[in-house]
């Protein structure tokens, strides 16, 4: 009502899309409002679930990747919702390691044909600031950004807020 009232055919990007259903911030936009978008998930098992749950739809494209300043392979620790690039994270369970391609956001958006974002959902387990820093908001206008910030990330929260404020966003 406050942000998207009357908006038809919106565009979303969800980074850290998990399985596309559990904790999804974009599912309702796709299914109830016919929005189109991009679902990005780095952890392999989560991505396979994302493909099963949302990959067959006409409105969403899925991508197995993380977002970085430069292309590389990224090592992830743990599985499920707590998978993280930080192996010292208090949230992950020891043991499992996986790898994901890390791509530049500008390249991903260009390949996906996305030139504006109405809703960006960001839940990347401690890599929020690094991910936001790769975005060129001048090239890809973005209307609303939802950033998940956990108590364990308190040190980065003010930096994220400052970064977004410097790019014209306000906290709501």
Which stretches of residues belong to each language-model region?
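Phosphate/nucleotide-binding beta-alpha loop and adjacent structural elements of enzyme active sites
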Residues: 1-172
